[in-house]
Amino acid sequence: MNSTRWLVACVLTVAAASVIAVSAMAAPAAKTIVFCSDTTYPPMESLQGGKAVGADIDIANAIAKSLGDQAQIKTTGFDVIIPALLAKKCDAVISAMTDTAARAKQVNFADYVTVGASLMVKKGNPSHITGLASLSGKSVAVEAATTEKAALDVENKTLAKGGKAKITIKIFPADTSAAAALLAGRVDAYFADATPVLYYIKTTGGKFQSAGPQIESAPEGIATRKGDPLGGQFKTAIAKLYANGTMKTILAKWGLSAFALKK
């Protein structure tokens, strides 16, 4: 090889190496975002054949994809889900979690839907339940650490002040167990977000109905640790999913179009 050919070969080699280096810099390797989720809350999140499915799962996957990453779901009990996040056992929580002032003291939220709470009873409403006040002297199944549990506690204080019988609150670690208690006739009502209530009414062959109007609609959000840049990235990704129609498609798939964030 003469000197001219050698010089050209060197230049081409350096140029190729530069292109490879620039390409590597432009396309960083995708990372895995681990989401803690209480997979006992259909249609938001549940397990089918050992695999997590639901609206929240689809949303987590869509957000991760939007960020050039991938999502991993880690089943975690709702009563320990924020401690798990704070202990860095996951990067975020997506679990139909209501964005409340109390929770916002511990974590940041990227809101993605607005959901109210609902009471569910057996078909025919044998206990004549019409709202929280009508639960006096009756028993209600609810999942631990939920906003519904907190609302029942507040209602009991109101009933006590009025000299009325309190609600018997039966707390379950899994929401599916709370719903099963109503089906088995062990309680008069089940109290949860409107999303699982509607799901159970639609999928149980006429065994259940709602009782009274939805209560206290509020935003639900993805929780992240304070100071974690993921929180801001999630907000941007959620806005993008609404703008490009992805969120609309996901919510429609699970029968949840009515719970989209209002503009």
Residue ranges and their predicted role:
Residues 62-66, 74-75, 79-92, 106-107, ...:
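Short helices/loops that flank or line small-molecule/ion binding pockets
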Residues 38-39, 114-121, 148-151, 194, 198, 238-255, ...:
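Periplasmic-binding protein-like
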Residues 36-41, 74-79, 88, 92-100, ...:
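Beta->alpha turn/N-cap motifs
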Residues 122-140:
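Flexible hinge/capping segments at coil-to-helix
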Residues 29-96, 244, 253:
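Extracytoplasmic small-molecule ligand-binding "clamshell" domains
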Residues 80, 97-105, 151-155, 184-216:
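A ligand-binding cleft/hinge motif common to bilobed small-molecule-binding domains
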Residues 60-68, 148-171, 202-205:
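Ligand-binding cleft/hinge of the Venus flytrap
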